Amino acid sequence: EILYMMKEVQIQKQLSYIYITHDLSTAKYFADRIAVMYLGSIVEIGEANEIIENPKHPYTKALISAVPDASTGRANIIKELPIKGEIPNASNIPTGCRFHPRCIYAKNECQNTETMLKDINSSHKSACIFFNNI
């Protein structure tokens, strides 16, 4: 009910929100665009629908799969996409891709390559060097 009221006020007052959450299904409700952050860096950014329907970073994919959605069959994805290990200490951020210690797609180059946002299309970017395989 609170989310409904926030959306109503957003429309009536033509407001923008900075909405911080791990539940991307609620972010999609408010947002035209979504930026996903991991350990203080944006790892994926794009149109809300595209981020939810076609995630191109393993962390984004894991966040989406963590929220069961029976209508799309996402209830079982979390079993297929586990996140390994523990969250690294923010004062000792891993080299290369910040997500590589927990990523099931990680390869050796992920430990050594500083990831930058790369264009997937004109409005969607990912910091994963293997975004084509996700």
Per-range role (PLM):
Residues 1-76:
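P-loop NTP-binding/switch modules centered on Walker-like glycine-rich loops
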Residues 48-134:
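Charged, flexible cofactor/metal-binding loops and thiol motifs
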